[in-house]
Amino acid sequence: MRTKSLKKNRINVVTLGCSKNVYDSEILMGQLKANDKDVVHEEDGNIVVINTCGFIDNAKEQSVNTILEFVEKKQQGDVDKVFVTGCLSERYKPDLQKEIPDVDQYFGTTELPGLLSALEADYKHELIGERLTTTPKNYAYLKIAEGCDRPCSFCAIPLMRGGHKSTPIENLVTEAEKLAANGVKELILIAQDLTYYGLDLYKKRNLAELLENLVKVEGIEWIRLHYAFPTGFPMDVLEVMKREPKVCNYLDIPLQHISDDLLKSMRRGTTHEKTTKLLKEFRKTVPEMAIRTTLIVGYPGETEEHYQELKEWVKEMRFERLGCFTYSHEENTHAYNLEDDVPQEVKQERANEIMEIQSQISWELNQQKIGEVFNVVIDRKEGNYFIGRTEYDSPDVDNEVLIDATTVYLKTGDYYDVKIAEAADFDLYGEPLNVTTEKPKRKELKIKSV
């Protein structure tokens, strides 16, 4: 069926899931632009590409619902073609083809050339690092590796993304230079496992050397690290963080649990004692570091004693940033062979309690910031506030700094010294120092008479 409108050859890329998917969609859109294809936003395209997530049940449900939504639009004649790619398609392609046959074609996570061909575009190998960024202009994700070699019992990522494959340092530097040339000032380094970076290419953990090369890129102000693994963490990274002002005093390191019984069952390769020692070493070496972690509650076999151990440990460690999720029983994982024996309501109660504890910790830590001055980047304006972040905060998941937009003019993407005046549990309220109080007036256009 043909679309009701004349929107021909306009491609809408819909991205679901994590920052790695955002990056992959940006690469796809960069390739499409290089092929002179018209890439558009929601509702404007007659061709739709859905980049799905297949990590946990909620993400899978969202992906399936999105596919069904666009299939219905196709049936109604509002779009011509629907293509599906990403982790859900990689993991469940035969099932999806059977259950939702109205999708024109399904592609896995490594089938970009095939997807481009279906979109009547050529895969251009020479476009190293060139993409169409969808994040605010001041920051961008830099994916330094694909896949994962860890054997974590609960995780299906290796099924969808394959083994760990590091991107060469020179390629990443080239990509960073191109991003900086386009106005990007903050690089958020992402991978399934930053800790492993370089072992496959250089036979050693090479994250520190990568950072030393990236800090030389002109125009980059901040470099942020996301998704490290505790076992085998390269401690020389801390020395670079301490020495190089461009490397944010920030580390996202998912720890999942602290009970030795569960860490063993999860196949995390560490213990309560080793994990605590590692975190204390982080704080000793880089005292200003903000540590973000994520935890899982309700894993098979988690008893009340295991949970209490985790809860007390969270109180002891006082993480600057923390997220807590309920366990999702994923087929084809090692843990799927275990009984999912913690009731869902108990899982949710435990997650809620952990987040209540973290909210109090965050409030207490934020109160200590009142009166201090921080360098803040402005991400956007919402209503009567400019919204920014410190180097201790990543976009979307961490604290934000709110500045009254009725009293001062700030430029999105710029950095300002901001004095903190008030603090809530996850928000800071600040006053910028030494800035103009008015938005610059537009210059009048003077037309000379002839």
From Swiss-Prot:
Any single GO BP term: tRNA modification
General function of this protein: Catalyzes the methylthiolation of an aspartic acid residue of ribosomal protein uS12.
Domain TRAM: 367-434
Gene Ontology cellular component annotations, sorted alphabetically: cytosol
PANTHER family attached to this UniProt entry: RIBOSOMAL PROTEIN S12 METHYLTHIOTRANSFERASE RIMO, RIBOSOMAL PROTEIN US12 METHYLTHIOTRANSFERASE RIMO
Cofactor(s) the record lists: [4Fe-4S] cluster
Keyword vocabulary terms for this entry: 4Fe-4S, Cytoplasm, Iron, Iron-sulfur, Metal-binding, S-adenosyl-L-methionine, Transferase
Occurrences of domain Radical SAM core (ranges): 134-365
NCBIfam families the UniProt entry points to: 30S ribosomal protein S12 methylthiotransferase RimO, MiaB/RimO family radical SAM methylthiotransferase
CDD domains, A to Z: Radical_SAM
Reaction catalysis annotation: L-aspartate(89)-[ribosomal protein uS12]-hydrogen + (sulfur carrier)-SH + AH2 + 2 S-adenosyl-L-methionine = 3-methylsulfanyl-L-aspartate(89)-[ribosomal protein uS12]-hydrogen + (sulfur carrier)-H + 5'-deoxyadenosine + L-methionine + A + S-adenosyl-L-homocysteine + 2 H(+)
Family: Belongs to the methylthiotransferase family. RimO subfamily.
Protein name as it appears in the record: Ribosomal protein uS12 methylthiotransferase RimO
Pfam families documented for this protein: Radical_SAM (PF04055), TRAM_2 (PF18693), UPF0004 (PF00919)
Top-rank lineage group of the source organism: Bacteria
Residues at which [4Fe-4S] cluster 1 binds: C18, C53, C87
Keyword presence, Cytoplasm: yes
Source organism per UniProt: Christiangramia forsetii (strain DSM 17595 / CGMCC 1.15422 / KT0803) (Gramella forsetii)
Primary location recorded for the protein, binned into one broad class: cytoplasm
Cofactor note as given: Binds 2 [4Fe-4S] clusters. One cluster is coordinated with 3 cysteines and an exchangeable S-adenosyl-L-methionine.
Annotated positions binding [4Fe-4S] cluster 2: C148, C152, C155
